[in-house]
C-alpha cells in the first residue's frame, strides 16, 4: 500500500502503531534474576565469580566437602550409579537417566543456610540418617545465577550430606551461604 493512497488519519495511525511497536521492542526486558522475593545479592555476587571444580561422589562415604561462601562446579554422575544416604524426598520421582551426586558440609554455627544452584535439581540434606526439611525455596526461570535457592535450618558441627538428583545436566554450580538475618525471621 502506498502512503499517498492513505488518508491522513490512517497514515498517522499507521505511523503511531509503528512507533509504539518499536518502543516496545526497545524496552529492556525484566531481569529474571532480579525478581526473587528474598534478598539474593550475596548469592548473585558469589555466582559472578569463578567456580572451583569438584567431583561429586557416588555415595556418602568419601564424599568431598564443600564450605559455605564458596562457589563450586560439581561434576555429577548418572543417577543409576549413585547410592543415596536416603532416597530423594522428591514428590515426583526423577528420571533414571538424570544426573546426581553427593557432597558433605559442616557449619560452625547453627542457623538458617541457603543452598543455591544454577539449575533445577532436587536437594536433600541428611544429618545422622535423617532428612532435614527445607524451610523455604525460590526459583526463577531464565536465571542461572542462581536459578534455585533452598533454605535449611542446619545444626552446628554436624556432618551433613547434600544430595542432588533429578537434574538433566552432568554439571551443577553450587554455593552454600548463611541466610541474611531478615530471612531467618520469616
Feature-to-residue mapping (PLM):
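Non-catalytic extracellular/lumenal accessory regions of secreted precursors
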Residues: 27-97, 183-186
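N-terminal signal peptide c-region/cleavage motif recognized by signal peptidases
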Residues: 20-24
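Short, surface-exposed beta-strand/strand-loop-strand elements in extracellular ectodomains
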Residues: 120-136
